């Protein structure tokens, strides 16, 4: 049984929608394929000892300390110094204080999901010089913690009370790859321009189900996935996507978008998936026919009444354009018999096209 648990811990992560924490090792089953895998600790990092004492009521095994679901109101004392994963989720902790994690210089993952944390002392995470994953979701934070470890690769803080994202918060976090800030009362004015810009390895941002009305400015060119679903964005202009040359997936479903300005998609030359379903679009966004790599376009549940024969595919048979594997246009006013058959001439599998079912 123990061997099975450790194998789960060391499994490669995968992504499948918003992060849902349900147990100790579910933190490895993460959104949308970040590609981050936990490092196997090198036994040479630790000196032989008789073994530290496990905190009361917690479970300790192979440098994993599980103290979840115990009703704790503070971080346990005397945590084993060789701990690499500390699970404190589903407790009643209200504050993270300086010294709570002292001597945990080998900690790689810290799970604080579903507590009542409203305050984190500025130096609380300073001793964690090897921390790569920090999970703070489902708490009561109004701002992100200060002075997070420079080794951090993944930060998840959805379902808090965060209203501000400051640029200084991410200063020096050059190893960051994944940031999840969904389901917070964030407004566009609360995100400083260029707040994410300095993180040169950042590839995934999710700010879904908030109150932002525009795409954040100054996003890093390293981004490959941007998920802004369930917000109050009304328009996509060319400037908002400028410089996102590596973006492969853009999620803008369930907003109030009525227009995508001409030239916007040209700023994302490697885009493969575009999710614009459940918005207020009246026409197919311009630039799809010229886009070389795009393969999936979701436009269902909009107000599109006309689809032109050149909206999706270039003239003739342009072999340089990737074939679509998914185009959804159902639940729009346009009738399927009003669409010319040649409209989807660059779609080689007809089952990839979804039409009809408009009420």
Curated annotation (Swiss-Prot):
This protein's UniProt keywords:
Corneal dystrophy, Disulfide bond, Extracellular matrix, Glycoprotein, Leucine-rich repeat, Proteoglycan, Repeat, Secreted, Signal
Source taxon at top rank: Eukaryota
Q: Which Gene Ontology molecular function entries are recorded, alphabetically?
A: extracellular matrix binding; extracellular matrix structural constituent conferring compression resistance; glycosaminoglycan binding; RNA binding
Which InterPro entries would you find in this protein's record? Answer: Leu-rich_rpt (IPR001611), Leu-rich_rpt_typical-subtyp (IPR003591), LRR_dom_sf (IPR032675), LRRNT (IPR000372), SLRP (IPR050333), SLRP_I_decor/aspor/byglycan (IPR016352)
Q: Where are the annotated glycans?
A: 34, 211, 262, 303
UniProt signal peptide: 1-16
Quote the Pfam families the UniProt record gives: LRR_8, LRRNT
Pathological condition linked to this protein in its record = Corneal dystrophy, congenital stromal: A corneal dystrophy characterized by congenital corneal opacification consisting of a large number of flakes and spots throughout all layers of the stroma. It results in progressive, painless visual loss. Corneal erosions and photophobia are absent.
Function, please?
Answer: May affect the rate of fibrils formation.
Protein's name in the database: Decorin
| Gene for this chain | DCN
């Amino acid at each position: 049984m123990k061997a099975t648990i450790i194998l789960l811990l060391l499994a490669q992560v995968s992504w499948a929608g918003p992060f849902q924490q349900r147990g100790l090792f579910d933190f490895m089953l993460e959104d949308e394929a970040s590609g981050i895998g936990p490092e196997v600790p090198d036994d040479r990092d630790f000196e032989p000892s008789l073994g530290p004492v496990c905190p009361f009521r917690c479970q300790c095994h192979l440098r994993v300390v599980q103290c979840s679901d115990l009703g704790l109101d503070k971080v346990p004392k005397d945590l084993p110094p060789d701990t690499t994963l500390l699970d404190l989720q589903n407790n009643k902790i209200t504050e993270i204080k300086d010294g709570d994690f002292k001597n945990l210089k080998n900690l790689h993952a810290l799970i604080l999901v579903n507590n009542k944390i409203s305050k984190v002392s500025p130096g609380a995470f300073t001793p964690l010089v090897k921390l790569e994953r920090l999970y703070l979701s489902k708490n009561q934070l109004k701002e992100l913690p200060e002075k997070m470890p420079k080794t951090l690769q993944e930060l998840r803080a959805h379902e808090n009370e965060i209203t501000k994202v400051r640029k200084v918060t991410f200063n020096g976090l050059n190893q960051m790859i994944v940031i999840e800030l969904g389901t917070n009362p964030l407004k566009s004015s609360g995100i400083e321009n260029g707040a994410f810009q300095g993180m040169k390895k950042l590839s995934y941002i999710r700010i879904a189900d908030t109150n932002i009305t525009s795409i954040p400015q100054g996003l890093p060119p390293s981004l490959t996935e941007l998920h802004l679903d369930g917000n109050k964005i009304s328009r996509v202009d060319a400037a908002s996507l400028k410089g996102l040359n590596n973006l492969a997936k853009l999620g803008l479903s369930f907003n109030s978008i009525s227009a995508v300005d001409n030239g916007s998609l040209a700023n994302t030359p490697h885009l493969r998936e575009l999710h614009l379903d459940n918005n207020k679009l009246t026409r197919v966004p311009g630039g799809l026919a010229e886009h070389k790599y795009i393969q999936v376009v979701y436009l269902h549940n909009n107000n599109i009444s006309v689809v032109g024969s050149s909206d999706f595919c270039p003239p003739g048979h342009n072999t340089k354009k990737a074939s679509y594997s998914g185009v959804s246009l159902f639940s729009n006013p346009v009738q399927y018999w009003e669409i010319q058959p040649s409209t989807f001439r660059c779609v080689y599998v007809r089952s990839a096209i979804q039409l009809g079912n408009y009420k």
